[in-house]
Design a protein with these regions (language model features):
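Carbohydrate-active catalytic/glycan-binding domains of CAZyme proteins
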Residues: 1-520
Length: 520
């Protein structure tokens, strides 16, 4: 037996999709405009996971420049068939629905095969039937006319894998389980004991989120819904329950008759979510031809006992800590930037063991790829810390640490120049309006600074360490403006390292020695 702890992927890893290839499991998640896109995780026991890469790791795979933070890549699906891995997803910023493939799930993955106007809508999935034929399953607006916001339907069509093109006729097979349902989305097809099953989300990815299921003996006909639909939801538990918004599930079987579902859910703090939607695991049993999620419990559990042998990895995904160093030739797989990782914005070779971020014109309050590398926030009680060597030579130049929800809502902790002296400046950007919370002198010349942010629930304290001395710079900073409920959108916070010349020309840089996030 092995114990799995929920969430199995902490931090904003929403819209999980899972597949099994032999003894190996793989999960992918939405990434929106973060680059690289679509993180991919591997496990052999469903409890312990390692990140093996990011599927969309080249600019030509991820055209999202100029997008809002919650645009870009929506709801990927991963499937394995006949020795090849397939990932299908939607780029709502450019190109729509597309497929990439790989023989090795760690990459490299192919360039996108765009399906074009023949494949409208979002949240596509692939299904391989017993005869080897592949079918596209997606969502689209009601073709008879959208009567209300979220009036969509689920449809299928054959996909020719040689041409990567939809062929034949499409057919709507389901519109959701509840009368007047909104946003039937995230559909996945399976064939189990002679039935085609369609699992999907409905109710919108918020308080009314849920999982429903339907089935049919034939693929191209209207499906029948489970009498117990929705088969899983947390909406009846109230907004103050520790885990909310549960939905968007994908089934997997372990090869020994045991079934599981991965789904998204959110952990609020004081009624607000900083970490977005995370990946959770639940057991599935079958009764009278229908799945039962979390039998006898009816909600997501903190821990699950799984009937399998434990399998560990040297570098496992942690729910409590991330220690990032810079000795490799490429950025750590956990690090993300906004829109694109531009090679001219950073260097790992000019000073081995240090991440050099150049003070480019682009700033984090604009919708542009800037000199930023961050990791996902994973807890409400934690500290984040970085060590940085920097000397601003112009008043426009700045470097430091950022808690980032989006370009209009973030908290910056920066070293910058005032006359001939360095200053440590804490700036809150809320709905696009910037306000300096505090600024303190920080000496002269090039120095090594350690910046630490200590967060406890929705409050923060900020420390600066230099010349062997520590200073409490700011405290009692509210973090509520950087939550999804206040800032809007579909993402959670990242926190990371940043440098900018704020619209001016500059050849300066900051060298970062480490980045740490630890639960406390």
């Amino acid at each position: 037996m092995v114990t799995a702890k929920n969430p199995i992927l902490s931090g904003f890893y929403p819209d999980p999709s899972i597949c099994r290839a032999g003894e190996d499991y793989y999960i992918v998640n939405s990434s929106f405009v973060y680059a690289p896109g679509v993180p991919i995780f591997h496990s052999r026991d469903l409890a312990h996971w390692e990140q093996i890469g990011n599927i969309l790791d080249r600019p030509e795979q991820l055209p999202v420049k100029g997008s809002e933070i919650s645009q870009g890549i929506y709801a990927p699906t991963i499937r394995f068939h006949d020795g090849l891995f397939y990932m299908i997803t939607t780029n709502v910023s450019y190109g729509g629905n597309f497929i990439v493939t790989a023989k090795d799930p760690a990459g490299p993955w192919s360039d996108p095969y765009y399906l074009g106007e023949d494949a409208p809508g979002i949240d596509p999935s692939l299904f391989f039937d017993d005869d080897g034929k592949c079918y596209y399953c997606g969502t689209r607006p009601n073709p008879e006319g959208v009567r209300y916001n979220g009036d969509w339907e689920i449809w299928v069509q054959e996909l020719d894998l040689r041409q990567m093109k939809l062929v034949g006729e499409s057919m709507a097979i389901w519109k959701g389980a509840v009368k007047g349902v909104i946003w039937p989305e995230g559909p996945h097809l399976y064939k189990i004991d002679g039935y085609y099953y369609l699992m999907h989300a409905e109710g919108g990815t918020g308080p009314e989120h849920s999982i429903s299921i339907a089935r049919s003996k034939k693929l191209f006909q209207w499906f029948e819904g489970c009498p117990r639909n929705p088969i899983f939801t947390h909406r009846n538990l109230g907004k103050n329950y520790p885990v909310i918004y549960a939905g968007h599930g994908d089934l997997v079987e372990d090869g020994r008759g045991n079934w599981y579902v991965v789904m998204l859910a959110s952990r609020p703090c004081e009624g607000h979510s900083s970490m977005g939607r995370e990946t959770f695991l639940a057991k599935v049993t079958w009764e009278n031809g229908w799945p039962v999620i979390a039998e006898g419990v009816g909600h997501l559990e903190d821990t699950l006992e799984l009937p399998t042998k434990e399998y560990r990895f040297p570098e496992e995904v942690s729910s409590t800590s991330d220690h990032i160093s810079f000795w490799e030739k490429t950025p750590d797989k956990r690090l993300v930037s906004v829109e694109e990782i531009c090679e001219e914005n950073y260097s790992l070779s000019h000073r081995p063991g240090m991440l050099r971020l150049y003070t480019k014109k682009e700033k984090i309050s604009d919708r542009n790829p800037c000199s930023y590398f961050g990791i996902r926030q994973k807890n409400y009680a934690f500290y984040a810390e970085t060590g940085m060597e920097f000397e601003p030579k112009q008043e426009c130049e700045t470097a430091g640490m950022v808690l980032y929800q989006n370009h209009e809502n973030h908290l910056r902790m920066e070293i910058r120049k005032r006359a001939d002296e360095n200053y440590f400046v804490v700036t809150a950007c809320i709905h696009g309006e910037e306000r300096i919370l505090t600024e303190k002198p920080a000496g002269e010349g090039r120095q090594f600074f350690k910046i630490r942010m200590h967060c406890d629930r929705q409050k923060a304290r900020i420390w600066l360490f230099r010349d062997g001395r520590e200073s409490l710079i700011a405290e009692d900073i509210s973090l509520l403006p950087y939550t999804t409920e206040e800032a809007g959108g579909f993402v959670g916070c990242t926190i990371g390292m940043y440098a900018s010349a704020n619209g001016q020309d500059s050849s300066n840089y900051a060298d970062f020695a480490w980045f740490v996030q630890n639960a406390i």
